[in-house]
Amino acid sequence: MKANIHPDYTDLKVTCSCGNAFTTKSTMSKDAFHIEVCSECHPFYTGKQKVVDTAGRIDKFKQKFGKFSRG
C-alpha cells in the first residue's frame, strides 16, 4: 500500500437539534457535525410514528379514475 494517500481518520462530535450528542469516527476535516434528526428524536425510533390511513384515499381515487382502467 502507498503511504500518505489516505485521509486522516479522526473523532467527530455529532450534535442533534434535540440536544443529543455522540462521537464517531470520520474522515471529515471538521471537528463537529450538526444533524436535524437522530435516533433519540426520530418518530420511528421513539414510537410516536403516525400511521396514515390511505384506504379512504385509495377508494376515492378508484372511484374517480376507475372508469379509465385497462382491465
Swiss-Prot record:
Entries under InterPro entries matching the protein: Ribosomal_bL28/bL31-like_sf, Ribosomal_bL31, Ribosomal_bL31_A, Ribosomal_bL31_sf
UniProt keyword annotations, A-Z: Metal-binding, Ribonucleoprotein, Ribosomal protein, RNA-binding, rRNA-binding, Zinc
One annotated GO biological process: translation
Cofactor entry: Zn(2+)
Similarity annotation: Belongs to the bacterial ribosomal protein bL31 family. Type A subfamily.
Xref: PANTHER family: 50S RIBOSOMAL PROTEIN L31, CHLOROPLASTIC, LARGE RIBOSOMAL SUBUNIT PROTEIN BL31A
Name of the protein described by the UniProt record: Large ribosomal subunit protein bL31
Native source species: Laribacter hongkongensis (strain HLHK9)
